[in-house]
């Protein structure tokens, strides 16, 4: 069986999940991996056959997605070419982790596509909802990477097709200690913004990991480090 596993390349969450899932799929068939977007830092322990521009979101530095940069990064002609040229007819099973090229290629060519992401869980009728409705955000979740069947991930399992988050083996096998610090990682917010929000918590020690810096520094009760998978996991395992 030939399997296409398509990953959203905005941030490291989707790729982190794939690191655990792909080896299991490889036991069931021949797996090709696709990644679209460019805002991910984790190393892939498996070959990536398709590296596409896609329709990725661009993180800002003030929290959330930078709408302007995301719009400027959008290349609709290239996206259309990628969708139409992706040879999904060669695959028996297509899985999309909120990845738009594979999902829309399946839509156009009338192929089943399985959604496997935390995003599909948020659309479930039983999913916890915010007090105010974000109509545009909800529309994006529905239309960005449409799939024919869905399996979601959420902190609470409220349906048979919704599962608790997948935690990487590297994290699960870490020795847990308590060095007294609080570990912080907010990829869509730069370190200066985080420091501003946490400055009044002077009784606590923080280890902050930021993708927006190249060298570490210390400021009062804050230690700030450039993003490193191993260092972050170690910090998290030894946090308070």
Task: Describe the residue ranges of each PLM region.
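Conserved nucleotide-sugar donor-binding subdomain of glycosyltransferases
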Residues: 64-93, 100-101
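Active-site-proximal region of nucleotide-activated glycan assembly enzymes
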Residues: 112-163
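A donor-sugar binding/catalytic signature common to diverse glycosyltransferases
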Residues: 93-101, 105, 115-116, 231-240
